[in-house]
Regions:
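Preference for long, amphipathic alpha-helical scaffolds in soluble/luminal domains
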Residues: 16-46, 50-429
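N-terminal Sec-pathway targeting helices
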Residues: 1-12
């Protein structure tokens, strides 16, 4: 495969579920789908191609892959999958020089996670904070710029929000780069003091961690109450194109559809980080903070289920077409991102009490959570046979974003599986 065609396929599969179905078929017809891979993309034939029933339905567009039948996976299987992913991502997530990596380690392993140098990840993060003067003349703490392979804090307020998400005490003492002693509360107060409400698309894109943070501190609660309906309306507007789609699932992202255009142009929900799933999680946290009724949240959760069906159908079709192609690895990496973040999002809604798992609607949502765990198993099995996690050093040097996705999205998948476990417990009672 020449470099141009190889590059085209990187874009196509890297933008999985973005209208690539017809493009991959075109490359298949033209004979440009196969070819030798680089050190970072060479792979065996994936083992997790979807079952024939799933790929058939995806190819015909009649439905998305059916949820697994009860009993296909048990809670113990989900825990084993969680632990297996953990074995693969722990080293990368413990990078003592990357606050971003350590924050993802905290997400996956909890507040007592250790950095690669043996200290608590929270302490390793704190030691990279540097002091400066803020616009208001007050002392400000921030992270120095990271590197491509060891990001620092790519999204505003990411680190402090994660500390609170995983249960770090706001009173905990942090020792900074210059030896100063501050508390987690210092970082919270700094964020709440300096952050403005989102008012344009760029600010909305970077807003999830601030919005979630507002729900976790008493001083942020009034703003959370005020922003909850605004944020929910914004989410509804940006997912409307999903509700509007009426075609076959496997055709949802074909060239010419509104979903294809939104994904290609990074607009509406697809303009946000990780497909808008962080934004939806923040919106759910805001809704829970104002004690929103499950009935008011249900329409948006229904859109999420529809989106899962549409994207699953496209992933299944692409997996069928690219089976055995070296760069199919990128498809599985994108699947790890989507299914992991989606399980994390739907599981958060359950955790926050935004749906009742004993009702018929709640049982449907729990079934979707269990199906997402099955999706993650197929994806991880494919990556395991592909050897992606065994080749992390080569991937890191050649395709650093793929490396970061394997680590970061693996951590989000772990939290998604943790949040999905109660849906399995419900069926096993």
């Amino acid at each position: 495969m020449n470099q141009r065609n190889k590059g085209v396929l990187y874009v196509l599969i890297g933008a999985a579920a973005a209208g690539v179905y017809l493009e991959v078929k075109r490359h298949e017809r033209e004979g440009t789908l196969h070819g030798p891979g680089s050190a970072a993309t060479a792979s065996a034939t994936p083992s997790a191609a979807p079952p024939s029933s799933a790929t058939t339905s995806a190819a015909t567009g009649t439905s998305s892959a059916p949820p697994p039948q009860a009993g296909e996976l048990k809670g113990s299987d989900v825990q084993a999958l969680h632990d297996a992913i953990g074995e693969r991502v722990r080293k990368g997530a413990s990078d003592a020089g990357s606050p971003w990596a350590l924050a993802h380690g905290l997400i996956a392993f909890g507040k007592d996670f250790k950095a690669s140098d043996g200290q608590d990840a929270v302490d390793a993060i704190a030691k990279q904070l540097v002091k400066s003067k803020g616009p208001d003349g007050k002392t400000q703490w921030s992270f120095p710029p990271g590197s491509a392979a060891a990001p620092s804090e790519p999204h505003p307020h990411l680190i402090v929000d994660v500390l609170l998400q995983v249960g770090v005490n706001p009173k905990r003492t942090l020792v900074t780069q210059d030896g100063s002693k501050i508390s987690v509360q210092t970082l919270i107060d700094q964020a709440l003091r300096g952050a403005q409400d989102p008012s344009n698309e760029v600010e909305w894109m970077d807003s999830p961690w601030l919005l979630d943070l507002l729900t976790r501190d008493p001083k942020g609660k009034p703003r959370a109450t005020r922003l909850a309906p605004i944020t929910w309306r914004k989410l509804s507007e940006e997912t409307q194109l999903i509700a509007d789609y009426r075609g076959a699932p496997a055709a949802a992202f074909e060239n010419g559809t509104p979903l294809y255009a939104a994904k290609r142009n990074k607009t509406q929900i697809y303009g946000h980080h990780c497909g808008g799933l962080h934004f939806m999680q923040a919106a759910l946290s805001l809704e829970a903070s104002v004690n929103a009724a499950p009935a008011s949240v249900a329409p948006e959760l229904d859109r999420l289920l529809k989106r899962i069906a549409l994207e699953r159908a496209t992933y299944n079709a692409l997996a069928n077409m690219t089976q055995g192609v070296p760069i199919s690895r990128l498809l599985w990496v994108q699947g790890l991102k989507f299914f992991g973040h989606t399980a994390e999002t739907l599981g958060l809604a359950r955790e926050l009490g935004l749906y009742d798992p004993t009702t018929s609607e709640g049982k449907r949502l729990d079934a979707a959570l269990r199906a997402l765990a099955w999706d993650l198993k197929r994806v991880f099995d494919a990556l395991a046979k592909d050897g992606a996690y065994q080749q992390l050093d080569a991937i890191k040097s050649e395709r650093v974003q793929t490396y970061l996705d394997l680590i970061g999205d693996g951590c989000h998948a772990m939290r998604g599986l943790t949040r999905a476990l109660p849906a399995f417990d419900q069926t096993e009672k």
